[in-house]
Structures are given as structure tokens and as C-alpha cells.
């Protein structure tokens, strides 16, 4: 069994938390494309990664999503990286920063971002450097603070309780850094 197919390590195995954010052209990998990916170490957001990708030919382009991320389809088709190249770069960066530690994917509504990253890693490379290790900040907030409903875990609600200096801009690296700051607050602030 190769390292990327192994389950997360046992208790005591070193872990490295990596904040990841994506911008997409649709709601799922089967109906849209991964357009941009930003990542940084939670404990050192200056160690970061960012790539823009070419859309999958024929994949949907949701105008509502485009208004949010403000990426231009024609520019991405011309200047974005081929998905296999971008995912090779991402996996290489994750492998470099994690060393012998288990890489843990951290996101705000991690299931959305993780499904695109996992799909693209498997589809274009045949491996996912995160395995199934993901930490969702919304769920962490809900459990840590005893929040009684998922609806009360939106970015505005969490930011009101745990303000951070970084802004949510819908640029993947900016948002990964904002999530890293929020993760540090959720993990290290006293209760």
C-alpha cells in the first residue's frame, strides 16, 4: 500500500493542517470545473500555493458562480493550467510541506472544496495527498461552541464570534488564508 492510499495515521502521528479553498464553475465536479485552488499552512500562511486551471471542455459555466469568483472563462481557457499540471503542482507542494506528517485538508464547508480537490487529484493523478483527512471549520465551530443548528454556522456568524483580519474575497488564496486565521482561532482560543 503506497503512502497516498494509507488511512490517516494513528494517534500521535504528526499532522500538518493545510487550509484549502477553491473557485468553481458549478456545484459539483460532475457538473462544473475546478477553476482556482489556493492553499496555505494553517500555522504559517506565508507557505502557500495558488493555481488557476483551464475549465473542462464542455463543462457547465454557472453565471451565478462567475459573478462571485469573477474569473474569466476565456482567460482561463487561454492561460490557465491544464488540470493534470495544476494537480501535479498541488500534490508536489503538499508532499513538500508535509514531510512525514499526515496532511489534513482544512476548509470552511470543507466537503464542497474537498470533493473538487479529491475528484481532480484522483481523476488526473490517481492519488489524493490528503486521503480522507479533512477538517470542516463549520462543524468544528458547531461542536466547540454548542451551536444548535447548521444554519447558524455561516461565515458572518462565525466571524462575529471569531473575527480575523483577513477578508473573504472569493479569491482562492485570500480565502485559504482567511480560513487559516479562523482555524487558528477555533483551535487555539480558550473556551
Please name every model-derived segment.
Residues 2-114, 160-162:
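Conserved non-catalytic scaffold segment of RNase H-like nuclease domains
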Residues 1-7, 150-155:
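Short, motif-level signal for alpha-helix interfacial/capping segments enriched in acidic residues
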Residues 121-131:
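A short alpha->loop->secondary-structure connector
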Residues 30, 117-118, 145:
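Short, well-ordered secondary-structure micro-motifs
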Residues 54-69, 73-76, 137-180:
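Active-site-proximal helix-loop-helix substrate-binding element of RNase H-like nuclease domains
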Residues 104-111, 115-116, 120-121, 154-191:
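Acidic, Mg2+-coordinating catalytic module of metal-dependent nucleases/exonucleases
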Residues 134:
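Short aromatic/basic micro-patch
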Residues 32-35, 119-123:
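Short, glycine/charged-enriched secondary-structure capping and boundary segments
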